[in-house]
Amino acid sequence: LQEKVFSIIGLGAEAAREAGIAVAHVEAGLRSRNNAMPEEYNRIETDKISSFLFTTEPDAEKNLRDEGVSGKIYPVGNVMIDTLIRFLPIAEKSTVMERLGVKSGTFALITLHRAENVDANLGIALKTIKNSLQGVMKVVFPIHPRTRDAIIKKWGERDFGVWCDRLHIVEPLGYVDFLSLMKNAKVVLTDSGGIQEETTALGVPCLTLRNETERPITVEMGTNEIVGLDATKIRESLKRIVNGTWKHGTVPELWDGHAAERIADILIAA
């Protein structure tokens, strides 16, 4: 390093430690308990070497204390929700729903990209989603390039076109357009971690297509439920959502749009 650096946030943690630079980990302490996920190893190892551990929820703080980390723990909130709050007024001006021919509160928004669904269970995942939502509500599925490639590799270009028709698959969207869809969806079905948090902040029902979550506060306080690829759970959840009996959820403490400011204040004062 040619310049003197006070701390490294996130990427480059191991190299920073070797260079004697303090590491600050944003979203520290999140644990899925699924050691097959590469992210799980990265989270644990980064927390071990971090001097500043910035957490988004109480479970993360408990995980860090249970693991006996040496760094100092700071509950600061969620920087992803900072971004959501900042861009929401812009997203409200998006024309994406008009372009896709859907109306607010009438469609399901789908995202699917994790290895456990795309590499190992792609056919099951797509059929479960299609069969669960068919005749219930419209679907919008901005497809991840990894998922697109997996469908084409498994079934070919022709069948990819068939899936596009069945699931209203569209090209990947920018953040503002996607945020507009997420805010206006009747329900979001996803295997993304961040979307679990964003839907809780927006008060939109979320069905997580995984068997675990590293963000349990979205289930305990928010609008999220873990359903995996269980068709029965998905259909029962959709029925509650359509009937208006889904839990309302509350926004966790400190998810107020000021997490980044708290982090900056802590680092400046250190």
Question: Can you annotate each of these PLM segments?
Answer:
Residues L1-V139, T147-A270:
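Nucleotide-activated sugar donor-binding and catalytic core shared by glycosyltransferases
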Residues H144:
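Conserved C-terminal portion of the radical SAM core fold
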